[in-house]
From Swiss-Prot:
GO terms for biological process: cell morphogenesis; embryonic cranial skeleton morphogenesis; in utero embryonic development; limb development; T cell homeostasis; zinc ion transmembrane transport; zinc ion transport. Transporter for the divalent cation Zn(2+). Mediates the influx of Zn(2+) into cells from extracellular space. Controls Zn(2+) accumulation into dentate gyrus granule cells in the hippocampus. Mediates Zn(2+) reuptake from the secreted milk within the alveolar lumen. It catalyses: Zn(2+)(in) = Zn(2+)(out). This is Zinc transporter ZIP3. The modification Phosphoserine is found at S125, S129. InterPro entries: ZIP.
Length: 317
């Protein structure tokens, strides 16, 4: 138990600093070097696809079995037996809840792109691609150099409108930070509620990769909006702290060791599993495999990410 607690605390610290660095680095060091930007875009895109494979294994090889085990424990306490796929249904409820919250946020914002969109990493694709926005960073004021080419008029689809994010003021950026924060709490909950070391490690790898890339997207949007470094640091700390907050909540629920805490753990893990489904299929795979460049290489990284985490499930930590 002590080793498990130490592992979760290390996960809290690790994810926090990964996200903080990912958020602030673009604000501090982005340069108008098109060749370097193109290379960075390709590397981030491949890392993102690798993260998609990691999340597939995390969801189906680690998190889903954990939800099944926890539900079985809860049902056995009440002497209830059923063949109904409760774990799968609970995860789908979490998935639909995440989609609903996303669309609710977008309805109030009167926008259509997904609220946690890694389209940032698909920037600079060829003309005629299905990505709507291929220019996630366009300089403001003294930062007048374009990091990526401007999007073509023929592009369509859903994407995070980073080009427009800074125009009306800070409200859109704040709404993005709020959405990212709410999303991150559930991912942190999934980590904090785990009872086995190998599941903690596999979840940590998936969350760390995905959330770091999301933090980079946030950093690019803050750089696009010419946010001062001090204000950017405040926003970055806020978002970066949400995973540790979720882990802390999960630890508190798990340490209660009561029937109510077991029920809460099963429900929250199932709902968090739905969030992972949303991230995997509607954020990562839908965006990355939509691109017409490096498709086979992305599939290779997708399989590689899955294989790495699927193998880690069999390890005992």
């Amino acid at each position: 138990m002590t080793k498990l607690l130490v592992a979760k605390v290390l996960c809290m610290v690790g994810v926090f600093f990964f996200m903080l660095l990912g958020s602030l680095l673009p604000v501090k060091v982005i340069e108008a070097d098109l060749e370097k930007a193109h290379r960075s875009k390709k590397v981030l895109s491949l890392c993102n696809t690798f993260g998609g494979g990691v999340f597939l294994a995390t969801c189906f090889n680690a998190l889903l079995p954990a939800v099944r085990d926890k539900l079985q424990q809860v049902l056995s306490l009440g002497h209830i037996s059923t063949d109904y796929p409760l774990a799968e249904t609970l995860m789908m409820v979490g998935f639909f809840l995440t989609v609903f919250v996303e669309q609710l946020v977008l309805t109030f914002r009167r926008e259509r792109p997904p609220f946690i969109d890694l389209e940032t990493f698909n920037a600079g694709s060829d003309a005629g691609s299905d990505s709507e926005y291929e220019s996630p960073f366009v300089g403001v004021g003294n930062r007048s150099h374009s990091l990526y080419p401007e999007p073509t008029a023929h592009t369509h689809g859903a994407g995070l409108r980073l080009r427009e994010l800074g125009r009306p003021g800070p409200l859109r950026l704040l709404s993005l930070v709020f959405a990212l924060s709410a999303h991150s709490v559930f991912e942190g909950l999934a980590l904090g509620l785990q009872e086995e070391g190998e599941r903690v490690v596999s979840l940590f790898v998936g969350v760390a990769i995905h959330e770091t890339l999301v933090a980079v997207a946030l950093g690019i949007s803050m750089a696009r909006s010419a946010v001062p470094l001090r204000d950017a640091a405040k926003l970055a700390v806020t978002v970066s702290a949400m995973i540790p907050v979720g882990i802390g909540l999960g630890l508190g629920i798990e340490s209660a060791r009561s029937v109510a805490s077991s029920v809460a753990s099963a429900l929250l893990q199932g709902l968090a599993g739905g969030t992972f489904l949303f991230v995997t299929f509607l954020e990562i795979l839908a965006k990355e495999l939509e691109e017409r460049s490096e498709q086979l290489l992305k599939v290779l990284f997708l399989v590689l990410g899955y294989a790495v985490l699927a193998g880690m499930v069999f390890l005992k930590w």
